[in-house]
From Swiss-Prot:
One Gene Ontology CC term in the entry: DNA-directed RNA polymerase complex
Tagged with keyword Transcription: yes
Protein name as annotated: Probable DNA-directed RNA polymerase subunit delta
Keyword terms: DNA-directed RNA polymerase, Nucleotidyltransferase, Transcription, Transferase
Quaternary assembly: RNAP is composed of a core of 2 alpha, a beta and a beta' subunits. The core is associated with a delta subunit and one of several sigma factors.
Gene that encodes the chain: rpoE
Length: 200
């Protein structure tokens, strides 16, 4: 036999079968008051006792109820699956409550060990090369060789690049082209008359 000690005055005169679980949850939390938040399972048990529903009916309704509890703006999760009414807390107070709960969780959690990556395609093949195993960039202590990096602040890098570029140009271009070449800038321009002739 179920205990039905909880009576909610808000629903006096209404058929319990017509009430939604979310309405009953709100009324239960309002009756309990601030500083009496409830764990989800306790809240569900209170709702079940008040409505007098069977275990199978409650189990069937749980996914919808949990979704409504999350999306209904009047409820707030305080961590550890503990629920309260949003109206109990000011905006700043909500952040403080959640942060305090997160800090308590951080104290209890041990640091996780770094996991070694496993290549599923190697299957113990001794001839296979594991390219992930010898990648120096994967190591935390890896530092790039400063001689191989390009530094924007170093003018010697730019000077070396210019000298290398000039050397390449001198290899390609003959030395006697220097001053004898006249560039006719008019030849390089494309006039409107040329455009009309090329289209026809």
């Amino acid at each position: 036999m179920r205990r039905n000690a909880l009576e909610l005055e808000v629903f006096a005169g209404q058929e319990k079968s017509e009430l939604s679980m979310i309405e009953v949850a709100r009324a239960i939390l309002e009756l309990r008051g601030r500083d009496h938040e409830m764990h989800f399972s306790d809240l569900v048990n209170e709702i079940q006792n008040y409505l007098g529903t069977s275990n199978s009916d409650i189990r069937e309704a749980l996914p919808l109820f949990y979704t409504e509890l999350n999306f209904d703006g009047s409820f707030i999760s305080l961590g550890d699956n503990k629920w309260g009414l949003r109206s109990w807390y000011g905006v700043d107070e909500i952040d403080e409550e959640i942060i305090a709960l997160e800090e308590n969780d951080d104290d209890e959690v041990a640091p996780k060990a770094k996991k070694k990556r496993v290549n599923a395609f190697m299957d113990g093949d001794s001839d296979a090369i594991d390219y992930n195993a010898d990648d120096p960039e994967d190591e935390d202590a890896y530092e790039a060789d400063p001689a191989l990096s390009y530094d924007d602040e170093n003018p010697d890098d730019e000077k070396n690049e210019v000298e290398a570029y000039d050397a390449e140009i001198n290899e390609i271009a003959p030395d006697d082209l220097g001053e004898d070449v006249d560039l006719n800038e008019d030849d390089d321009e494309f006039s409107d008359d040329d455009a009309e002739t090329s289209e026809e």
